[in-house]
Amino acid sequence: MANFTPVNGSSGNQSVRLVTSSSHNRYETVEMVFIATVTGSLSLVTVVGNILVMLSIKVNRQLQTVNNYFLFSLACADLIIGAFSMNLYTVYIIKGYWPLGAVVCDLWLALDYVVSNASVMNLLIISFDRYFCVTKPLTYPARRTTKMAGLMIAAAWVLSFVLWAPAILFWQFVVGKRTVPDNQCFIQFLSNPAVTFGTAIAAFYLPVVIMTVLYIHISLASRSRVHKHRPEGPKEKKAKTLAFLKSPLMKQSVKKPPPGEAAREELRNGKLEEAPPPALPPPPRPVADKDTSNESSSGSATQNTKERPATELSTTEATTPAMPAPPLQPRALNPASRWSKIQIVTKQTGNECVTAIEIVPATPAGMRPAANVARKFASIARNQVRKKRQMAARERKVTRTIFAILLAFILTWTPYNVMVLVNTFCQSCIPDTVWSIGYWLCYVNSTINPACYALCNATFKKTFRHLLLCQYRNIGTAR
């Protein structure tokens, strides 16, 4: 009967308790085949998935954004875990002992810790980057360049290497001897459960708290920005229009304009040419004509106005000349002008007038430039609405992706780190199989991440499909 002895091993950023046996055979043949099949499949899916992520960002320009460069770095870490860490740990589980020697053991542990810590650092960078994007939208994007992203990614990897690699590789030389048996593989300075728990606090619990707080702020700020930039509906536009018409743009007393004022009204638009006066006065009429304006007066009015106490603003009165004259021709607009006439809509309230202004075509000849101007303004408005909608869609897409990544990280890493906490106070409370499952869950996080990108980002999903189906011509158009 095998004699199992619990020992300490490694798991990502912490240590895991492994078992060894005197007979060097922990599982039956069927069990070993099953374990190798499952773990080998997970390793293959992890490698393929993260290669797809890296290729997608490389070949699709729509995915070449600062945020996705951070995901590229995270995919590199996940790829290393899938290609090396998963398979080496599977060998350790199936064999029941470490068969590859001390040098390979230390190299594996150093690689495992550095890569796992780099993954956590990348998650922190993604969270902080998104937090500053939504809380400082005017100042931070100017500094958020590709160069800055590269420096942050390099800092994450260098810091992870400095923190773990020298200590793992050279601790035995610092203390003067190697205390890890040849048939086992674990970090020598983490053999104390209290030290292991301290590393778990620094490497998992603290980052999780920081990322959770940041995500809450990101979510609240994103909702606020999306609501603020939401396109106005018809009711809101109508309400604003009515408010504008009711606002006192111009208040004035109703007075009779001085002589010659009406003659100058035609030039107030600034784009109408003053036509020469007619050679002969208008034809005689037996009585005076009256042209009453109820609620509007035009900027091209040429008659004198006369004060009237009724609700109409003015009454236009024409005198009766003595000699006939040819019919007046309509005044021509300047061909170079792109403006139309200005109509002043006026309402009288007591002794004051409330006036609003709107642009209307003066003549058929002026309708075309006015229509061009209107079309340009309409096009600008449509572009602004489209940009606001695109921005809101990007906000939701990035926020969903970050949420999925953080959720996957917390769900897969929490079981093992809870066991680390329990093991600090009770080293015999957790079965060896449970330790192994918790350890593997940390690795499974690297398998889940590419699925999170595809589920939360349609562009990633389409690019994955084009790459898998070898539809390379469609990759550049995937959105």
From Swiss-Prot:
Residues 271-333 are annotated as: Disordered. PROSITE patterns: G_PROTEIN_RECEP_F1_1, G_PROTEIN_RECEP_F1_2. GO terms for cellular component: dendrite; plasma membrane; postsynaptic membrane; synapse. GO terms for biological process: adenylate cyclase-inhibiting G protein-coupled acetylcholine receptor signaling pathway; cell surface receptor signaling pathway; chemical synaptic transmission; G protein-coupled acetylcholine receptor signaling pathway; G protein-coupled receptor signaling pathway, coupled to cyclic nucleotide second messenger; regulation of locomotion; signal transduction. Keywords: Cell membrane, Disulfide bond, G-protein coupled receptor, Glycoprotein, Membrane, Phosphoprotein, Postsynaptic cell membrane, Receptor, Synapse, Transducer, Transmembrane, Transmembrane helix. This is Muscarinic acetylcholine receptor M4. CDD domains: 7tmA_mAChR_M4. It is found in: Cell membrane; Postsynaptic cell membrane. InterPro entries: GPCR_Rhodpsn, GPCR_Rhodpsn_7TM, Musac_Ach_M4_rcpt, Musac_Ach_rcpt. Glycans are attached at N8, N13. Disulfide bonds join C105-C185. Belongs to the G-protein coupled receptor 1 family. Muscarinic acetylcholine receptor subfamily. CHRM4 sub-subfamily. It comes from Homo sapiens (Human). Residues 1-31, 90-106, 172-193, 423-436 are extracellular. The modification Phosphothreonine is found at T459, T463, T477. One of its GO terms (molecular function) is G protein-coupled acetylcholine receptor activity. The muscarinic acetylcholine receptor mediates various cellular responses, including inhibition of adenylate cyclase, breakdown of phosphoinositides and modulation of potassium channels through the action of G proteins. Primary transducing effect is inhibition of adenylate cyclase. Residues 55-68, 129-148, 217-401, 457-479 are cytoplasmic. The chain crosses the membrane at residues 32-54, 69-89, 107-128, 149-171, 194-216, 402-422, 437-456. SUPFAM superfamilies: Family A G protein-coupled receptor-like.
